[in-house]
Amino acid sequence: MTPELNSFPRLAPGCRLNEKNQQPRTLLMPERALRLNGPSLEIVERCDGQHTVQQIIVEVQKIYSKAEPHKVEQDILGYLALLQKERALDFAL
């Protein structure tokens, strides 16, 4: 399911990012972990319940300004949907 643009993604209970000084940055989930870098890290760091999906898209598009904006948006929406399916994210309206 595609996340709504006005929703606020946040890490699901039991999920967290490892400390910033620990490399590689990792999304820790119950009984598994996902290494993050580049765009995936930029996205997950903003999933704090304070940024809307739309705000995350705009901020990441600024970072990757040479990429086609529509492609960046679709990639972000797809990644957020994947993390939701994996129960790593919750969304609030």
Model-derived segments and spans:
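Long, charge-rich, low-complexity alpha-helical segments
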Residues: 33-93
